[in-house]
Amino acid sequence: MGNSFGCSASGERLVSAARDGDFVEARMLLDCNPCLAKYSTFGGLNSPLHFAAAKGHNEIVGLLLENGADVNSRNYCGQTALMQACRYGHWEVVQTLLLFRCNVTRADYLSGRTALHFAAVNGHVRCLRLAVADFIPSAPFESVNTQTNGDSSNTKSKHEQSGLSKFVNKAADGGITALHMAALNGYYDCVQLLLDLHADVSTVTFHYGTSMDLIGAGSTPLHYAACGGNLKCCQILVARGASCLALNCNGWLPLDIARMCGRHWLEPLLSPNSDLTIPMFPPSNYLSLPLMSVLNIAREYGLLSSATNSDEAEICAVCLERACTLAAEDFEPTIPHRR
């Protein structure tokens, strides 16, 4: 890999610069030897791109990619830079990686997690939304949803929705989906968005290989939400069709999980005989972003190339322009302007 270039000393300097966010040092090293962008450490096979993505150094990420770094390179765990950025919530980096057409559907070697799993487990809803940008047409949610549920014969749309469904419902080891993870950790925004993206509310973990022995195999996202204890997550799952009567392989209801985990405030909602009124939940506001159009325009016109100079003003996170022409308040609570 990288050490085959015979520049291990310079390569390690670039790794340090990428990790520490030293843009000047990174640019100097790459000006001298652009091949260093493909350098990787021996032990962990982590590239400078992995380090920069994990730390959120977006300008260095762009610099490395423009100098030939492989946007889909993996470390020893099989994780890509996109997974690292989603894991730590660096949505600006996710945006940059998408501009360079990273593969969002790849899964790591250790647990089979995709970028969606890494975003969902830590509640990074902006990263989650960006990761599905190429699957969602740039149209209002109501239009997209009507087209999906109606009698439209649009083959392209059906293909896009099929690809989106497969991606959103992709299971990691043990059958755990991104929805399971978001529900367990109580990230309502992620749960809401995943459900709007047609995540399967009734999907169950595998009967083998599950790492959540406390919850049990064959568990639904509602079982996981009951363990996590977030009332709002449980409410929206029930509102979207999750069954309070679903039994896992241990014969436990979501109510049983809630009791075992000490989540007694969930009992009135999860009781099979509950007569509580479930609130209505509107579609996620994050779906209103026309990200597919924005990304395609940026890719076509190469808007990223002007964003890697640290001495210039940063681009707007919404419209990808220097002088923003969009009103931030029109997109609340979506991706905000950087300050």
List the predicted regions and their residue ranges.
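Ankyrin repeat domain, specifically the short helix-to-loop turn at the C-terminus of the second helix
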Residues: 30-35, 62-69, 96-103, 130-138, ...
